[in-house]
């Protein structure tokens, strides 16, 4: 089901949908605007963040969390806006073709976030995760994972910029409940002087992968020689399980929501859901 409007159409005539949500055959179906009103109410109450924090604060969960070993990473969340909506901010450019969703000729047009913006979702930014991949209108989702059991302990969403991962990493680690001396594993995108210095200023040892292609790494042998560095680099890859579940199962690959606040709300709920999926098995394991 691609949208909330289509969902309500299904509930209207699909007996399986009615059975699943407990509606009798002759019960009236609520209006689709109920979703929007309830979502706005949850946004105002910051329910997603509070729910995420409440799961981690549970007395049964807290002993599972490492207070000093963490990993950080980010992923792109494709916006619901299409590339057709990415138009010059000054209003120039060829007009779209006839029709509600008319075609536009982008041939020869240079497009960037400085000169263009989406008319459908102004908070979305043109971005790509790596060279060789197509650029898409996206948001950036970020997670900090504790390394003992691979549970997410911090999550946030930002506009997809070149420094978004490092900026979000600094903010999340600064607000994290952790031991005074901690370690943070990360990939080579975090290997910058600014990020490494910020982590050390927070009392966090940056176990970031070294970026050796054409520039000097911000960390040296004083960090990489320790056995803990290799362990952090091995375990940090588990954070991809959070993003993999969110995109394949949680519907996070392409958001149906618009605007940074709403997309962030949806991302945080999905990360909390990932923790909940993991917890029954972890709690049932012998101490």
Model-derived regions: residue spans:
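Structured core elements
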Residues: 71, 142-144, 152-156, 183-185, ...
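Short arginine-rich
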Residues: 18-22, 281
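Polybasic low-complexity intrinsically disordered regions
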Residues: 9-12, 21-202, 274
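Helix-centered, glycine/charged polyanion-binding patches within enzymatic domains
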Residues: 91-99, 105-106, 188-268
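TerminUS-proximal long segments
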Residues: 263, 273-275, 280-283
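A short, flexible helix-boundary coil/loop motif
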Residues: 249, 253, 280-287
């Amino acid at each position: 089901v691609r949208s909330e409007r289509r969902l309500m159409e299904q509930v209207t005539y699909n007996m399986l949908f009615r059975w699943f949500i407990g509606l009798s055959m002759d019960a009236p179906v609520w209006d689709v605007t109920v979703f929007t009103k309830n979502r706005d109410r949850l946004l105002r109450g910051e329910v997603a963040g509070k729910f995420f924090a409440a799961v981690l604060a549970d007395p049964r969960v807290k002993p599972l969390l490492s207070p000093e070993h963490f990993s950080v990473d980010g992923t792109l969340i494709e916006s619901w806006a299409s590339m057709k909506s990415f138009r010059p901010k000054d209003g120039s450019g060829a007009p779209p073709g006839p029709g509600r969703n008319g075609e536009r000729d982008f041939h020869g047009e240079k497009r960037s976030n400085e000169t263009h913006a989406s008319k459908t979702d102004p908070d979305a930014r043109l971005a790509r995760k790596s060279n060789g991949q197509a650029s898409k209108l996206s948001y950036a989702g970020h997670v900090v994972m504790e390394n003992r059991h691979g549970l997410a302990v911090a999550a946030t969403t930002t506009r997809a910029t070149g420094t978004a991962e490092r900026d979000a990493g600094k903010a999340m680690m600064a607000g994290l409940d952790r031991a005074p001396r901690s370690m943070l594993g990360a990939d080579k995108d975090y290997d910058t002087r600014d990020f490494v210095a910020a982590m050390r200023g927070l009392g966090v040892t940056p176990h970031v992968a070294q970026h050796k292609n054409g520039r000097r790494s911000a960390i040296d042998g004083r960090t990489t020689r320790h056995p803990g560095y290799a362990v952090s680099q091995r375990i940090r890859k588990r954070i991809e399980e959070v993003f993999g579940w969110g995109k394949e199962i949680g519907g996070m690959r392409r958001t149906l929501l618009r605007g940074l606040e709403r997309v962030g709300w949806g991302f945080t709920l999905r990360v909390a859901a990932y923790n909940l999926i993991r917890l029954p098995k972890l709690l049932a394991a012998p101490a």
